[in-house]
Amino acid sequence: MREITTGGVWTHTETMSGADAVALAQRIELLGYSTLWLPETAGKDPFALIGMLAANTTELRFATGIANIFHRHPGVMKQAAMTLAEQSGGR
């Protein structure tokens, strides 16, 4: 597991289009931030969104901060984490 460093950005994306979220992630990466935090409490599915954002960035790491254990079975959480880790090269 990689260490999550300082210099991250926490944001909500529920009002953004997918293209706007990609542009934001690319800008955050360009500015040198290490991590983009996306909450699960409102808006879009963070795991699906992270897959799209990871495909359009090269070094930016992603975190949910909160993943609601009452809405997601632990096995499904593991599947999502494993899939995203593979798709993003461990980011």
Describe the predicted segments one by one:
Residues R2-M16, H73-R91:
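Flexible, glycine-rich active-site loops centered on histidine and acidic residues
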Residues M1-T64:
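N-terminal beta1-alpha1-beta2 module of alpha/beta enzyme domains
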Residues A63-V76:
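Structural motif corresponding to the early beta-alpha repeats
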